[in-house]
Amino acid sequence: MDDVVSVQEETVTAMPDFDHSRLQIISPAECLRLMRSVPLGQLVYTYGGLPAVRLVNFLVDDDTIVFDSGPGDKLRAAERGDVVAFETDVVDAERHLGWTVTAVGHLSVVTADEAAALRRTLPLHSWLPMDDPHLVRLGIESVNGRRLVPWGQRPRSGV
């Protein structure tokens, strides 16, 4: 994870333009912009000692990701403050282009008062019907991304 960059870093001078696989490295600011451009992401967390991946609709609010959760394993992970990953992507399989962004951080449950305030300002609406939704926050502690670019734009040899 030596190429993971903290969200708070303003400039990145040591990071190469391409990684060893000749994928273009996306800056932290661009990662957040790309995450804001899609409505769905994959929450990756531990459930019963094993990795679990759940599709959720979400919003990026500053350096946090927020989403609704009903009672269950995602909410319990937030109540424990688990470290999780959150992945978003767009892929054009026909043209072999696309990008992926992964954010890592701790989950938390948003208090009822703060959730009410956020719901007034953010256009967050769960895609699933929920009787008792809880607003969950992922505080982004690191973010990294890669872009698959056309062959002509990639370096000819490894970096």
Where are the regions a protein language model picked out?
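Charged, gly/pro-rich active-site loop segments
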Residues: 2-23, 85, 90-159
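Short, basic/aromatic recognition patches
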Residues: 17-42
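Amphipathic coiled-coil/heptad-repeat helices and related helical stalk/stem segments
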Residues: 27-28, 71, 120
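Short beta-strand segments
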Residues: 38-70, 86
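Short secondary-structure boundary/capping segments
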Residues: 57, 75-76, 126-128
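Short, acidic/turn-prone active-site loops that include or flank metal/cofactor-
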Residues: 71-73, 90-91
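Short, surface-exposed beta-strand-loop junctions and turns on beta-sheet-rich folds
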Residues: 73-75, 152
